[in-house]
Every structure is written in structure tokens, then in C-alpha cells.
Amino acid sequence: MLYPLLGVFGLCAGVTTLLFGFGGGFFAVPLLYALLLTSHAAGSPVALHAMQIAVATSATLMIFSSALATWRHQRAGTLRWDLVRPLAPAIALGAMAGAWAALYLDSTWLRWLFIGYLLLSLLDAWLRPGFMRVGNHGPVPLGKAAATLAGLPIGALAALLGVGGSVMTVPLMRRRGASMGTATAMANPLSLPMALAATLVYALVPAPGANLGAGLLGYIDLRAALAMAAGAWLGMHLAAPLLGRLSDTLHARAYLALLACVLVVMLVTGR
């Protein structure tokens, strides 16, 4: 495994976690998936489970990156905990179900689910009103029932695909009146319960017959996660001066542009 390259992956993940709430998954999953396929023989256990390893390692990275980004946003005063608390328990429950399902899905199917999820997210944000421009009113908190109904699928899909909750929570909060700064800041603490629950499942409940070798805890590549975490720390340090300095429109466009870049990477990366 090329650890300096993983450090660069982590640096990109750190920047996008702090500024866009991605938690690292949108960079870590496609890049680690591609690296695993190119560094292991076709048909080997690691190659056959490359997507699961990428997703599981991404979830582990998110524990570190989302926690650090949450701390930085708390210091910057950009967090709204009244919007975070109602969603967190349902996201954690959904994440456990999503991670368990990912263990038993074929890696190719998981890849295409990831691609489909990205494409739908882009189309929804671009075509449905409420994402590119929001009103002047402040964000409206979700009620308990609405938070549960929204949190369960957010947690399940985020853990299934290893992407964090940003791609669902940011559009949700945008359409409830949140600025991009507030919406992306809240994506980080909302990714934490997902990352913790998913990592627990990926570490302790591996799929039967998956003998992946040393250095892995369940499906989690611990060495890759550590290398990317080091890069993520540096990336957040470099991105910190930009917090609160991006215009809302530029922030929203950059968010969608990053999703489009990841979609292209996943489309051109295959077995």
C-alpha cells in the first residue's frame, strides 16, 4: 500500500470534511477502491471485497475527521446543536442496518449503488428548488417524528456507502433555510453517530469466508485509516482559514462540483 499516496487522499478528505461536511468518504471510498484494485491481483480476496474495505475504512476515518471538524466548527461558532440532536439517534440506528447490509452485498453492486446515489443527489440538488438558493429566514428544526423518518434512511445509506451523511443532510438543511456554512457544519456531528455505529459493525461482524489477511480488523484497513487520518489533520489545518469566507452561492456550487468529480472517478474506476 502506498502510504504517502494515502496521506494525500487523507489531506483531500480533511479539506472537504471541514468545508463541505463530507467526513472523508467521498474522497476516501473511490480513491481507496481504485488503489486496492491496482495493488492486488484480480480475484484475490482483497480485490473481491475492495468496495467493502473502502467503505469500512472510510467509516473509520470519519470518526477522526468528523470529530476534529466538529471541534473546529464549535470553536468557530457555526454549529446549531438544536438542529443536530433530533437527527443523531435515528442516524445511528440506520447506520447499523446499512453497515450490516453492506457486508453481504457484492462489491460490484455496492459500487453501482454508490454511483447511482451520487447521480441522484446531484440531479436532486440541481433540479429541485431550494438547494442553490435559500430564503432569508433561519433554519427550521425538524420535529421528533420527522427527524426519525429522515434520520433512519440517512444513516442507512451513509453507512452502506461509506459517505457520511453530508450528501443527504446538507440538502435537507438547505431546504429548511440553512446557509451552506451552517448546513455543512452540521453534517460533521451528524456523521459521527453513523461512523461509530458503522465501524463497530464492520470491525466485529465480517462476512463469512472473507480471509483478507493481516492489517485488517474485519473489513477495516487500519494502516490505511491511520495514514489517511494523518493527512486529514493536515488538510483541516490548511482549510481552516477558509471557514466562513466562501459566499453561499460559491459554496453551493463547489459542493456540487466535488460530487460530480467523485462521480466521474467512480465511473472510470472498475474491475
Task: Enumerate the language-model features and the residues they cover.
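Juxtamembrane transmembrane-helix boundary motif
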Residues: 1-20, 27-53, 57, 66-160, ...
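Conserved, well-structured core segments that form the ligand-binding/active-site neighborhood
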Residues: 163
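A conserved regulatory-domain signal marking ACT and ACT-like small-molecule sensing domains
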Residues: 185-189
